[in-house]
């Protein structure tokens, strides 16, 4: 691999000790022509990143989500996620496993897996099309009253319910907010979407699984409630009356490096169920 990029969460490495260690290890194992250290809030020319053969992300799940949201529309470089955070459910390896991970990449003992992304636009608002690796949440504000929501699938009304909100989740996001709200766990390589009501006041409101090629439209009936759309828990936009949230599968994928010794169920047992 000739050109390698590194993105690090500076809040977790304020003195650059981890960054400097990773740079040394990358040179030792992969001997690249260039190592480009990229700010996680990068605002430069994305063309500078298109030549990367590998992007190493140092942080936790939040850092990876931010990278997916920010960079997925402009580059399709494979990502090696190294956990220097807390949970690290989405990452490829822990920082203690860095040597092994880089060696495996050196000898070609890895695979690149594609993870589904969601695309989100707000009807009636001029804004960019957003991407989400985990979920799109349409929900009331903290101090707002319960709101009513209409959910359409391919322009056909699926459900109307009162509650705190609704989560539209990818398989990757099924272990996040959706899981806490009673949604199902979904194998990450599937191309499906879950629709999960949040604290519904309607007894028959239950999570729904649909094919990823379906389009979802959420119409909050806003009266006295403040309703927001939140992308991966990192970006929030307030909705006004008559705004509708349109959600569909993005044409891009999040490409992440994985190793055969890290099965999905092993990670579930260790990090979600706390079973060694």
From Swiss-Prot:
GO terms for biological process: NAD metabolic process; NADP biosynthetic process. It catalyses: NAD(+) + ATP = ADP + NADP(+) + H(+). GO terms for cellular component: cytoplasm. This is NAD kinase. It comes from Clostridium perfringens (strain 13 / Type A). Keywords: ATP-binding, Cytoplasm, Kinase, NAD, NADP, Nucleotide-binding, Transferase. The gene is nadK. Involved in the regulation of the intracellular balance of NAD and NADP, and is a key enzyme in the biosynthesis of NADP. Catalyzes specifically the phosphorylation on 2'-hydroxyl of the adenosine moiety of NAD to yield NADP. Its EC number is 2.7.1.23. It is an enzyme of class 2 (transferase). It is found in: Cytoplasm. The active site is at residue 61. One of its GO terms (molecular function) is NAD+ kinase activity.
């Amino acid at each position: 691999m000739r050109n390698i990029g590194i993105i690090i969460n500076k809040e977790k490495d304020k003195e650059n000790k981890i960054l400097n260690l990773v740079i040394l290890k990358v040179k030792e194992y992969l001997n690249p022509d260039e190592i480009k250290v990229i700010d996680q809030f990068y605002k430069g020319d994305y063309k500078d990143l298109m030549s990367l053969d590998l992007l190493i992300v140092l942080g936790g799940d939040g850092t990876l989500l931010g990278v997916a949201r920010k960079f997925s529309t402009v580059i399709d470089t494979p990502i090696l996620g190294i956990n220097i955070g807390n949970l690290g459910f989405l990452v490829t390896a822990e920082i203690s496993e860095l040597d092994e991970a880089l060696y495996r990449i050196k000898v070609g003992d890895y695979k690149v897996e594609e993870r589904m992304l969601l695309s989100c636009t707000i009807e009636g608002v001029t804004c960019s099309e957003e991407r989400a690796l985990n979920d799109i949440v349409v929900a009331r504000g903290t101090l707002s009253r319960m709101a009513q929501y209409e959910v359409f699938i391919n322009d056909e009304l699926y459900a109307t319910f009162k509650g705190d909100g609704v989560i539209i989740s990818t398989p990757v996001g099924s272990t996040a907010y959706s899981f806490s709200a009673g949604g199902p766990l979904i194998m990450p390589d599937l191309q499906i979407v879950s629709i999960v009501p949040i604290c519904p006041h309607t007894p028959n409101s239950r999570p729904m699984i649909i094919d990823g090629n379906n389009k979802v439209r959420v119409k909050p009936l806003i009266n006295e409630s403040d309703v927001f759309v939140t992308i991966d828990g990192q970006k929030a936009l307030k909705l006004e009356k008559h705004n509708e949230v349109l959600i569909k599968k993005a044409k891009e994928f999040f490409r992440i490096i994985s190793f055969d010794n890290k099965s999905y169920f092993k990670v579930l047992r260790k990090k979600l169920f706390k079973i060694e």
